[in-house]
Amino acid sequence: MIGRLRGIILEKQPPIVLLETGGVGYEVHMPMTCFYELPEAGQEAIVFTHFVVREDAQLLYGFNNKQERTLFKELIKTNGVGPKLALAILSGMSAQQFVNAVEREELGALVKLPGIGKKTAERLIVEMKDRFKGLHGDLFTPAVDLVLTSPASPTSEDAEQEAVAALVALGYKPQEASRMVNKIARPDASSETLIRDALRAAL
């Protein structure tokens, strides 16, 4: 199936990027930690992908490197963790931060992620810690960033609304998302900056 895409970014609507390759536009759902690294619209980028088929939809998830994709695949194998929750986890933490939290059994850090309760956090620690033993090379080798241009930091009048919408898409309730963005909002910040700062503040 589709494992890698190289193309031109047509649109960026966190957490979805529209990537055109071969005359076809692919909607790719990305963790915000990966989304931050994307160049601006009109530039070329490469993403590693994982294709998920559901009864009501076919969704493509994208990552900047194979390590992030490997972790995503392992997350969705965990009981009670679907693609949407896995995306939220990797939006709140980088792949390495998540690995460290599991290895150190930092339950408090995990339950701060959207959709993660104590039982799910405990399950993640037990199941993922065991899997990491067999995935050490895949997760801990230096990641190679395949974004071809430096990221841009555009500003927008709708930055706060976009940030709230992205947080809701990641699993936060609308009121909670608005509160998170209002807490860190500033006039010169792009939506990506607001999302990143809101997620950091939540942790």
Curated annotation (Swiss-Prot):
| Entry-linked Gene3D superfamilies | 5' to 3' exonuclease, C-terminal subdomain, DNA helicase RuvA subunit, C-terminal domain, Nucleic acid-binding proteins
NCBIfam families membership: ruvA
Where is the organism placed in the taxonomic lineage, from the top? Bacteria, Pseudomonadati, Pseudomonadota, Gammaproteobacteria, Enterobacterales
Tell me what this protein is called: Holliday junction branch migration complex subunit RuvA
Q: What is known of its domains?
A: Has three domains with a flexible linker between the domains II and III and assumes an 'L' shape. Domain III is highly mobile and contacts RuvB.
Q: Which family does it belong to?
A: Belongs to the RuvA family.
What's the main place this protein lives?
A: cytoplasm
The protein's organism comes out as Salmonella paratyphi B (strain ATCC BAA-1250 / SPB7)
Per UniProt, subcellular location reads as: Cytoplasm
The record's section on Pfam families has: HHH_5, RuvA_C, RuvA_N
Q: Where is this region: Domain II?
A: 65-142
Stretches for region Flexible linker: 143-154
Which biological process terms from the Gene Ontology are attached to this UniProt entry? DNA recombination; DNA repair
**What GO MF annotations does this protein's record show?**
ATP binding; four-way junction DNA binding; four-way junction helicase activity
